[in-house]
Amino acid sequence: MAKIIGIDLGTTNSCVSVMEGGEPVVIPNAEGSRTTPSVVSFQANGERLIGQVAKRQAITNPEKTIISIKRYMGTDHKVNIDSTEYTPQQISAMVLQKLKADAEAYLGEKVTQAVITVPAYFNDSQRQATKDAGKIAGLEVLRIINEPTAASLAYGLDKMDTNEKILVYDLGGGTFDVSILELGDGVFEVKATNGDTKLGGDDFDQKLIDYIAETFKAENGIDLRNDKMAIQRLKEAAEKAKIELSSATQTNINLPFITADATGPKHIDMNLTRAKFNELTHDLVQRTLEPIKKSLEGSGYAMSDIDKIIMVGGSTRIPAVQDAVKDFTGKELSKGVNPDEVVAMGAAIQAGVLTGEVKDVLLLDVTPLTLGIETFGGVSTTLIEKNTTIPTRKSQVFSTAADGQTSVEIHVVQGERSMAADNKTLGRFTLSGIAPAPRGIPQIEVTFDIDANGIVNVSAKDKGTGKEANITITASTNLTDDEIEKAVNEAKKFEAEDKKRKESIEIKNNADQIVYQTEKTLTDLGDKVSAEDKAQIEEKVKAVKDVKDGEDLEAIKKATEDLTQTFYGISSKIYQQANPEGAQGAGFDPNNMGGANAGNASAGNDKKDDNVVDADFKVEDDK
């Protein structure tokens, strides 16, 4: 059976995992790292870089380097690169393609199916956008699961016989979630979830960037935030400082030649203490505490009921975050999981559940936000409460608001506000053909259906006429089937171009290597090579050099092959001249390996018994 991979598609970093021998295993990328930066960069020559190589050149190419695209999933945001517009789904698909390719290289087989995680507080359009990204990348997304839920699966897989209530605190690069779960007898039941999709490590970085920029402006009168290359250097320095302050109490930020004015170049050289960092980011840390309170209220549990607190996401390494959670909950934090990898591992476990590789595990997740429709007066009428276990189906009967009304518009909303206009519109559709009647008489049954991915379907039926209309929620920010198909084809084109470019690089590198090796060997051999042979090799070397920087790959391959064959021929001639007796036997004859002839094993050795003395020996048992 083909492998299904589990993917944590993160704001700043992504991770891919697979089940092997009943255990989730993180797949290293082509660069050897276990996580991949969610960064995409477009080069001047049309080349596309993804992951660590893209992040590495962000300073020199800030305008064409895209970071943290996950924050725009489910919106109409577009990225314009060289007059071509890309949606967040397309950029995310490029990251997914990289993860898919790395998984295929690791597994040695094609990968076509995946389980992808999303923040628990993602709304419907954000979930749809994630599925679309998977499709564009050539992946069938079998399940979308919430990140804290995935983390709990990874945490609890080897604790199937225990009964625990756990709180998962998930602070990633761009999003924040809290989920309360109950684990017992293989059932992972989410009781409540809360969060903030606009809060994460990026915001901690931004606080530092602003502080450094303001300090520099006060000293030099220059605002570095107006310089794209400078701001990219600040971002890199801020992230590095944040990471260092998780283990050290002070760090140095040193950015030479950050900018220049009439007086000459300007540099940044400043020390930053952990205390100052904590002061700058205090409000962000405090913002994470309210969702803990709300998720507890939603679950019906008190803090004293919680057995374990699982910290997930790279930003939970920040000491101030750990201290705040400890102080707020009054509990020690569990250190048993890797915060960067546990979500992807949980996704792989869910993939194992779907294939049957992981047995006796039941995952019961919840919808994070209230779902309803707009009714008379602009009121948002709830059909499905937040924290309802999914999949679920709920129906309610409504009526018309005016006499003789023959059609109704169903306005589907998601959110916690009492007025529909204050919530997020998921979609609208019209039910027509209602029999004319006084208001309040027609009976219109509205049904909400949420699948295991958290994707919403809504239908409306006139119970009098049997007329029915329905909609699978695809918000205006999501892509149509045609747009997805177009994006899929573009992604395949990119993949083919990347493959061709990689092949070109390998062929040219091979040509370079052979030219270098040939010239080095010629130098080493010196006058052992005749002038005629040397001229012949140099002619072939020149032929390779003439074509190796061009784009005719066949010509490069042919010239390289000609050089290789010529060099091998001349090398053989040199060795024959150096060892005329041994030249006839390439390697040794196994038939010579025996008795007194054991010493004659070298190639072409016809000499007999060159004073070889056989030694007698006997084996004595140990006493």
From Swiss-Prot:
> What is the induction note for this entry?
By stress conditions e.g. heat shock.
Query: Which PROSITE patterns does this one have?
Result: HSP70_1, HSP70_2, HSP70_3
Keyword line:
ATP-binding, Chaperone, Nucleotide-binding, Phosphoprotein, Stress response
In terms of InterPro entries, this protein maps to:
ATPase_NBD (IPR043129), Chaperone_DnaK (IPR012725), Heat_shock_70_CS (IPR018181), HSP70_C_sf (IPR029048), HSP70_peptide-bd_sf (IPR029047), Hsp_70_fam (IPR013126)
Q: What is this protein called?
A: Chaperone protein DnaK
* Keyword Chaperone carried by entry: yes
Task: Tell me one GO molecular function of this protein.
Answer: adenyl-nucleotide exchange factor activity
GO biological process entries: cellular hyperosmotic salinity response; cellular response to acidic pH; cellular response to heat
Q: Where is the composition biased (Basic and acidic residues)?
A: 605-623
Listed HAMAP family: DnaK
Cross-referenced Pfam families, in alphabetical order?
HSP70
Gene symbol of the encoding locus: dnaK
Question: What's this chain's function?
Answer: Acts as a chaperone.
- Give the Low complexity compositional bias ranges: 591-604
Q: Which family does it belong to?
A: Belongs to the heat shock protein 70 family.
Span list, region Disordered: 580-623
What positions are modified (Phosphothreonine)? T175
What domain of life? Bacteria
